[in-house]
Each structure stands twice: as C-alpha cells, then as structure tokens.
C-alpha cells in the first residue's frame, strides 16, 4: 500500500506521545548483527519515511491492553474492520495483547493474512520487533506457520526500517537473529518446516543467522544439512561466505568460531544420506571428514555404521587415510561396518585397503570377532566363504577367544554353522581359560529348556561330529524344569491338543468320503460306498493312526499329572513323539479323504496335493525340533534335519517379508 508524508503525519498525530531514546525497550536477546537486503521478488510493502525516528520502532509506554475475544477472532480471521474498531475506540494498537502476549501483528502473521499484516506494519512499525510470552517475534510466528509471502513482507519491512536508521541506532534491532525461549531463530523454523523459498529469503536477509545455535546446540545450518538434497543450494550459499583465496585452515577456523552448537556437518550429511550436501561441505571444508563426533566416531566410522555406501565411497575417493584412524573406543571403520552387518561396505574397505581386514580393536578382535559378537550372522557367513578372509576365523583376541567362542557365548546359532564348518581348526582352539567353544557351550547351557541355547549346542555338536574332530554321542542333554507349576501348564496344553486330535479323527472315521450304501436292494447295506477305493483305505489308515496316537498321548500325559518330576520327564519323552506323529497323520488323512472325493478333477487334485505337501513339510520342520531338542539323547545323525530346519526358517522369514511387501504395496495403492 502506498502512502504520502501527509498520511504518515496523520498517523503520528493519533499517537499520544513518543518515547525518547533512553526509554526504549530492549528486545534483543542475542546481540546485533547487520542485515543485508534480501534478494528475490517480494510483495510490495509500505514504505517508511526517510526521517524515521528510533521511537517509531517501539511501543507506547504504559500498560498492555487485554485483547478482547472479538478482536482476537477477527484478527485471526483476517478482518481489517478490527483495526478500524481499535482506532475508533482510541485503543493504542501497539499495547493490545492476547493472554499469551501476542500482538495483533503476531496473530495476523500466524494465520497468513498478508494484506492485514501490511496494514498493521504501516500503522505500527514497532510491532515488527515485539515479542510474545515465548519471546517470539511476528517473524518467528510467520515462519513457524509456513507463510512465505508474509515472511517476505516482514523481511522487507524490517530491512527498510533498519535502513532508515543510523548504524548506531539500528544495532541490536535485528529480528533475524533474535531467539525465542527455545533458542530458535526464525530461520531455524523455516528450515525445520522445510520451506526452502522462505529459508532462502531469510538467509539472504542475514548471513550470520544460519550459524546461531538453539538451546539444544542445533544451528540453522545444521538443520539445513540434515534436510538433505532439497537444501543443497542453500547450504552451498551459506558456506560460500568467504573468499576462495583464503587458506582452507583459516576458513575452517572462521567456521568454527561462527558456528554455534554441533559442528559435525559432514556426519549430519551422512545421516541425511545426501551425497550432494556432503560434496558441498567437503569441497568447502575438506578437514571436516577427519573430525570425530561427540561419540568419538570419524566420518568413515559413522558412514559405515549406518550403511551409507555412496557417502562412504565419496569419502574414500577423497582420501583413504581415515580407514586406519580408530574411534575413541578403539574400533576402526571396518569394525563399525561388521558390527552393523554392512558387508558391502566391508568389501569396499578391503578392496581399497586390503590390509584393513587385519585391523584389531582394543580387545584384539578382528572383523569376524566383531560380527560374531554382535550376531551379524550374514556378515560372518560371507567372510567365512571368502577365501581372502576365511583365515580370520582362527584369530584370537586378548582373552584367547576365537569368533566361534564369541558366537557361542552369545548363543548366536546362525553364525555357529558357518564358523565351525568352514574351518575345522577353529574347533580345536582354546582360550586363555583353557576352554574350547564346545566346553563353553556345555558348561553355560542352562538346565531348563531354553530353545536358542539348546539349538546352538546341537548345531555346534553336529559341526564337531561332521568334522570328525572328536566323537559326539548326543546332540542334546537332559533338561530339568525349574518350575513344576509351569511344566504342569505345558502338560495340560498338550492334553488339550491330543484330545482335540482324538475327537476330530474319531468323528472323521464315521463320516468317510462317499458315504454308505443305503439302498436295501443292493448288497452290503450300510457298508462304505467306496470301500474298495485305495485312497479311501489310505484315508482310514492315517485317520486311525492319528486317533490311536493321540489316545496314547493322553494316556501317557495322565501319568504326568501326578506331579512326580521324573514321571513328567519320562511322560514327555514318550508323549511328544506320539503327539507329533498324530498331528502329522491328521493332515495326510484329510488330504486322501479329499482326493477320494475329487480324484476325477485332475487339475484340482494336483493343486491340492502340492499345497498340502508344502504345508506338511513345513509342519515337520516346525514341530520336529521342538520334540527333538527335549529328548535326553539325540543321535548326531539327526543334525542334518536341524540344519535343514535352519534353512526352512530363513525361507519362511523371506516368505513373510514378501507377503508383507505385497500387502504393503496394495495398501499404498489404495
């Protein structure tokens, strides 16, 4: 809106008085910084008089006037009539405040009413610097709300107002560097909200604002780097504030002196996985890739830990010296990759620096130790199958432990097989306590049934048996329940399952496929119609086996109800195999019962047979280990079944992941 000198004089006449220079209110909480004019087009805003006094930028003295609900609602709705009401009532607009300390300009800026903001600025320029109870200026409020046009208008107004004053008078009046109660500037809110156009306007208005940190030690520059590729050009504009001819060390010193809070910009770029921003930072300040963060990690270690392959290669292309720089905990970048199971990064390290595979941490552990210790089974598997790293399996740390020792200590059954089967020498090695991996497993396994411990022990013993290193009589040991009450609940659950199987199979025996001969004129009245059908015979055979096995299970488990621990163990050793057998016979009986009825439909017969066969095998590999690992004696030859079960688990997990992915895609499309 345009105005003349006469209009400004009219507005000045409406004011009761002007405060003097020594009565002004100090609104700055962060020190003054000179401003530069913003670039880019902005909305036209009221022009200030060239002879603007400092007193024009501060509110009238006196107490605040409580904002009425009518004025609050009207300003929130963008109604200019509210200003006229305030004028007609003689209410000083500068003193009208809500219960949260918001001025009328705060409210108009919060809801993005551009024209109302312009008019308020024209009449009350002092409100540009007014802060609410949260120490936020209208510029804070507008940026937080994401109103770019309003922000541009406020920035242009502030720049015009300060330009009309002398340098001495304008010092300390820069709202671009004012911080709210959380220590955030308006620029921080713009970047946090990912408003690129708005952030660019604010950066152009004040080049020092991006370096100010909040109460959490996060600066606007840090937040811009964390925003990723979208803010690449803005980060470049912020960092390109010095002459290229200045020495890099001097530029780095200048950056450190200006940047408040967290200074690990390269780490943040890696976290954001923004290769463009990383290039901007390292091109301008190459030494940042050698710095360590608050956890003592170099850029390479941090990139390896999060698995950012492109960023890590970018750093390695610049320099590989960081590969041999350890963190504060004594680990090298290649150890971070092994710990977090990023095998492709390990390969990249070894490709560029072959000697890095021999690096040891403070515990004397190599990458295979670290992988085994942290249950990174896939990494351990790949390293043991690589001829260049396979020999690391016999390495011993400061305690004499091999990777296999550490895997056993952590009961990592996934790593056991590859570590023990790919290098038989590892089975013979003893640590400084004189213990082999087998000794640790057998001594540390708990007496009560804990699946992953007994599973690990069984796989280790099978690997020893397969290698021929020493004899193994059994893959399991006797388990003793610690709580008889919990064991009784387990027995009761088995009784319920066995009773259900017996009931279902008993009923199925009298509702056979094809029914019975009901015609009195035909021979064999009341006999099965398909009695001579071989598939019906198989149906009846497995149905009877399932029923009889379940009944035998019930009879056996009745003994377990007496509470005698020895009887419980012996009953379970008999009942569990019987129940497993009955559960497997039941689906076979069902399959042949269906085949009897639909044998003439070939395609349906094949489909049902394939589906049933798959789930039958799945049931074997799910229920089998549960029964086998509870037996006091399991011959070593059973180990092949356990290894196959491991493969089944991996396939099942992959199948579940695929199903989730498919349903996720369907959900996204909907």
UniProtKB/Swiss-Prot annotation:
Q: Name one GO biological process term.
A: protein ubiquitination
Write out the ranges of the annotated region (Disordered): 18-47
ANK repeat ranges, renumbered to this chain: 66-95, 100-129, 134-163, 182-211, 216-248, 260-290, 295-325, 329-358, 363-391, 399-428
What PROSITE patterns does its record include? ANK_REP_REGION (PS50297), ANK_REPEAT (PS50088)
Q: In which tissues is it expressed?
A: Basal expression requires light and salicylic acid (SA).
Up-regulation conditions: Accumulates in systemic uninfected tissues during Pseudomonas syringae infection or upon benzothiazole (BTH) treatment. Induced by light, but repressed by dark. Accumulates upon MG132 treatment, a proteasome inhibitor. Target of endoplasmic reticulum-associated degradation (ERAD) when ubiquitinated.
User: What happens when you mutate residue 498 to T?
Assistant: In E27; suppression of acd6-1-conferred phenotypes and increased P.syringae susceptibility
The UniProt-reported impact of residue 303 to E is: In E4; suppression of acd6-1-conferred phenotypes and increased P.syringae susceptibility. Aberrant complex formation leading to reduced subcellular location at the plasma membrane
Q: Which UniProt keywords apply?
A: ANK repeat, Cell membrane, Endoplasmic reticulum, Membrane, Plant defense, Repeat, Transmembrane, Transmembrane helix, Ubl conjugation
Q: Which chain regions cross the lipid bilayer? A: 457-477, 493-513, 538-558, 578-598, 603-623, 639-659
How the protein is affected by changing residue 300 to F?
In E3; suppression of acd6-1-conferred phenotypes and increased P.syringae susceptibility
The annotated consequence of gene deletion is: Reduced responsiveness to benzothiazole (BTH) and upon P.syringae infection with reduced salicylic acid (SA) levels and increased disease susceptibility and attenuated defenses. Increased sensitivity to biotrophic fungi (e.g. Golovinomyces orontii T1 and G.cichoracearum UCSC1), biotrophic oomycetes (e.g. Hyaloperonospora arabidopsidis Noco2) and hemi-biotrophic bacteria (e.g. Pseudomonas syringae pv. tomato DC3000).
Query: Which ranges sit in the Cytoplasmic compartment?
Result: 1-456, 514-537, 599-602, 660-670
Q: How does it sit in the membrane?
A: Multi-pass membrane protein
Q: Where in the cell is it found?
A: Cell membrane; Endoplasmic reticulum membrane
Entry PTM: Ubiquitinated.
UniProt GO cellular component terms: endoplasmic reticulum membrane; membrane; plasma membrane
Q: How does it assemble?
A: Component of large complexes containing, at least, FLS2, HSP70 and ACD6 in endoplasmic reticulum, plasma membrane and soluble fraction. Associated with HSP70 proteins during endoplasmic reticulum-associated degradation (ERAD). Reduced complex levels upon benzothiazole (BTH) treatment.
Its job: Dose-dependent activator of the defense response against virulent pathogens, including bacteria, fungi and oomycetes, that acts in a positive feedback loop with the defense signal salicylic acid (SA). Regulates the salicylic acid (SA) signaling pathway leading to cell death and modulating cell fate (e.g. cell enlargement and/or cell division). In response to SA signaling, triggers the accumulation of FLS2 at the plasma membrane, thus priming defenses. Involved in SA-dependent freezing signaling and tolerance.
Q: What is this protein called?
A: Protein ACCELERATED CELL DEATH 6
